[in-house]
Amino acid sequence: MAFNFNWSPLMADASFYTRAQDLLTAALNKSPKPPIIVDDIIVTELNLGSIPPELEILEIGDLAEDRFRGIFKMSYSGDAFLTLKTRVQANPLNTYLLTRPSFATPRPLAAATPLTIPLQITLSDFKLSGFVILVFSKQKGITVVFRNDPLESLKVSSTFDSIPFVRDFLQKEIEAQLRILFMDELPAIIHRLSLRLWVPEYRAGEELQTQTESANGEGPGQDPLASPPQDPVDALGNALNESEIESLSLDSSVETHSLFSQKNLLRLAALTDSQRTLSLFTPSIREVVYRAWTSPSDQTDASGGVTSPFSPVLSRTQSQVGSMSSFPDSASMVSNQSRSSTPSHTFSGYGLSLGAGRHSKAHARKRKKRVVDLRRPKTTDDAPSVSDESAFTESTSTPSICSAPMPVLDEQTDDPVTPPLSPDRDLHLPAIPERHGMSISRPALRREIASEMIRDTAESKPSSNPVGQAIQDEDLSATPRAAVRAHGASVLEKEKQATGSSAGSSRQLPSTILPFINDSPTGRVVDQALVERLAGEIARRMRDEKFLASNACGPFWDRHSQEESPPPAYGH
């Protein structure tokens, strides 16, 4: 079986060549070009020649009036030629530097200056040989698929034929590109051309698409502000209604570019905050200070004045576990600030000691255990030894509270930011230098109880009240250790009353006993009932403080929620 191909009509149709040139230009610029080619490759001339290819039928799979499918062996050695035009880079150093990373190559000043030269390439003397699968259909066009690489050789003529290196380089690069063209791009080009020739619907749709592209390419560009977002907001984040949007224009004085979506603004805000938290998905928590917000200068924030709980200082927070004075509530903090009479002593009680320091107080001194020793000393001195607590004794010639000299105690404080005690609490008592605490510290409570008891005794006649004695006995029975101490105190009082006349009047008392001694005009001693009540009250307070110390590591609000029981009633 033989076929006759009429090759002359393909050479006579001018529109066919124009369309083929456009398709070849698009195909050559579709794939990545080598760095030496700095411009688009344009097909300026195309000619299929007068010699047709030779086809040998190997297999026919389907044959009908409107379709055909078969396998051919094709060989071509004709006079077809193709002319291309582009621009190339003549400076190889510029091409080398563009294809290498900047940190690994030198940066010359003038040696790498680009130099582009126009290039014209003519491809001729094609020699093709390969197996072709051909499928023809009037509805689907022609499909040509090459089983193998059909390109054997071709001749490349260019402007740089006089330079052997450039000529060989162009020959190699163009051959590689043509192999890709025959295997991938040429079947698609032939298929589109066949559809344009035999399928009118495809031709009409292609013309409509061309008109649409030309219409879109002409005229002014689209205004991005012509269609505002769905949820527009102004520069301050306030939502805008439709009337406000219509009043805005490109010529108005209002900054129209600030009309952005609220969602986009939130994303930008999250991106801005990511440098503080190193994460875009960190949830925002109210009244929380992030560590990344602080700086090394935050250590001086504590000396800058009284800080309001509603405007905290941005500094790192340190939770000091086990320190009762490190967790003041707002009420005690405000009361201490309002009662403070010294303007130089300022502190910040917001949160967990904001600005108090960068490091925890695990290395600080341990809490001292204060023990009252009521045993009778073996020496001739009858005064009991007191270690960091208040023991209440009386003497026949005790000095007056108002006239007693103030002893000087050299004691260092544990907490450098502890505020001074309120002067309102010590109106009737001298301010004894001792460790000052917060509103829940123990020395303040002890002096308050003592001042109330002395005030009650001054108003009423000192007497032994059976009701008060019963309450005291009930309190002492609940705590055996306190009862032993109270019993020791009563025995000590009886012995001191018996030997009170022989005691010297110039005996110096400890500084912690001075606030609790009441001096009478006649020099008479304090009533024994008052001393017993004081000893019992101190024992009860020590028991409560021991209970609070055992719960120091518990939750903060649990300790404050425990209401203190009122002191026992005293007889008048």
UniProtKB/Swiss-Prot annotation:
Residues 358-370 have a biased composition (Basic residues). It is found in: Mitochondrion outer membrane. Residues 296-347, 387-401, 498-511 have a biased composition (Polar residues). GO terms for cellular component: ERMES complex. It is a multi-pass membrane protein. One of its GO terms (molecular function) is lipid binding. The keyword Lipoprotein does not apply. Residues 371-381 have a biased composition (Basic and acidic residues). One of its GO terms (biological process) is mitochondrion-endoplasmic reticulum membrane tethering. Keywords: Lipid transport, Lipid-binding, Membrane, Mitochondrion, Mitochondrion outer membrane, Transmembrane, Transmembrane beta strand, Transport. Residues 1-195 form the SMP-LTD domain. Residues 208-236, 296-405, 455-518, 551-572 are annotated as: Disordered. CDD domains: SMP_Mdm34. Belongs to the MDM34 family. Lacks alpha-helical transmembrane segments, suggesting that it resides in the membrane via beta-sheet conformations similar to those predicted for other outer membrane proteins and porin. Component of the ER-mitochondria encounter structure (ERMES) or MDM complex, composed of mmm1, mdm10, mdm12 and mdm34. Component of the ERMES/MDM complex, which serves as a molecular tether to connect the endoplasmic reticulum (ER) and mitochondria. Components of this complex are involved in the control of mitochondrial shape and protein biogenesis, and function in nonvesicular lipid trafficking between the ER and mitochondria. Mdm34 is required for the interaction of the ER-resident membrane protein mmm1 and the outer mitochondrial membrane-resident beta-barrel protein mdm10. This is Mitochondrial distribution and morphology protein 34. It comes from Neosartorya fischeri (strain ATCC 1020 / DSM 3700 / CBS 544.65 / FGSC A1164 / JCM 1740 / NRRL 181 / WB 181) (Aspergillus fischerianus). The gene is mdm34.
